[in-house]
Amino acid sequence: VHRSITGTYLKLYANVHNGADELMPLTGAQRRFHHTRAADPRDRVRILPVFVEFPPGLLSTHRLEQATRSVLLRHPALRGAADTAGGVPVLRIGPVPEGPIVREIVASDTDGAVWAALDDWPAERGSFRVILARDDRRDLLAIGFDHLVCDGESTGLVLDELMSRYQGGAHVPDSEAAAELRRYRDAVERQLAREHEASGPEALAHWTSRVRDAGPGLWGRGRDAGEPGGRESTWQRVALPGQATDRPFPVLLAACHKALARIPGTAPVAYTWGGQDGAGVVGCFINTVLANPQGDGVRESWWEDLEFVDTPFDEVVRAARASHAPWTGHLDLVLTVIDRTRRPAPVLDGVPGRFRYPPGTRIEDPVIVMAVHDRGELSLRIDHDPTIVPGAAATGIADALREPYVDAGHVAG
């Protein structure tokens, strides 16, 4: 009889929960991040950042502090921290920190300063990191999330609310905070129910067929979790055709698959998928999904995969190992697409901000492709760890991502 990882986890969680309001179960994505961090001798947090630039002197630290506290009261996941209860991984929801949360920095190199501050965030300040870096050219607002408590979709919700609370209405009644705690628990339980449902025989048969001939992984296999690694980045911009109705994701996924297919032994492309943006609940509700078509093109197989995208990553890994597939869970390339078309940069006191993507992020996977879709333009950023990924391979991936748009004549530079 098959017993899903999610089902087994929920039984263990029920034994330690005992009705405690502050203990929450972990979703499949949260389990993955928890496992990755537990295997890291340095116990490093995977940071999900958002950067917004405003004119110098515009932002008030006091108003930002009040807005941040309101956001923390409204979204309990941001007050959460990974923990264990009776040996079972959980998310423990804490109170809003007593001391100042927002950190203000004045520096000549604001890009470097905010990354250093995000990496060196005191544990007692919680999982939600807010930094205001100033110089004579700009105010740079940096928001960092422990990825275990917040996914990419949720960052947009948090930024919208932070800016709204900054403008006014920062008070959050206790009754509202309590209601949001119940709403978060309900969202997590519904997510886990979907993941359990997506871990049945049909879903596992589908993913087993997808990974049966997948490469074992070329770069992620030999990586030491304790090593800091390196980082090199390339950027390119693509002007999307105005008449196009398709979103760029399938094209990018096919390009990433094509790039790795040219390099023997690499693992399948992985991409992030999901979220509960429409529900208005902040948390980590995404999944890491593989794309490894057999025969058909990646776009066609992707449509078939959508029926099973709720199968947790750890369940797919277990199915691959049970079938003795060469691939056993290592990742070489992860694709993330950020859709800015639905969320333009915020406007404060009538002054529009501008999203920024400063270099300096720690590379968690050998290659990370981030595509930012903003109206008629696509910005592609390819980060790789040069200590394990050869420069020629990184260049080949960048070239493969350019090819569909070069052919169509839409490369902007």
Mark where each language-model region is:
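Acyl-thioester-dependent acyl-group transfer interface
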Residues: 2-7, 11-32, 37-48, 260-314, ...
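Flexible, Gly/Pro-enriched loop and linker segments at secondary-structure and domain junctions
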Residues: 45-50, 78-84, 120-132, 171-179, ...
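Short amphipathic alpha-helical segments
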Residues: 61-72, 115-118, 155, 159-160, ...
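Acyl-thioester-dependent condensation/acyltransferase catalytic cores
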Residues: 65-143, 150-153, 160, 164-167, ...
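Hydrophobic "lid/gating" helix adjacent to the active-site nucleophile
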Residues: 71-83, 245-280
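A short N-terminal helical cap/helix-turn-helix that marks the beginning
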Residues: 81-82, 162, 166-180, 210-219, ...
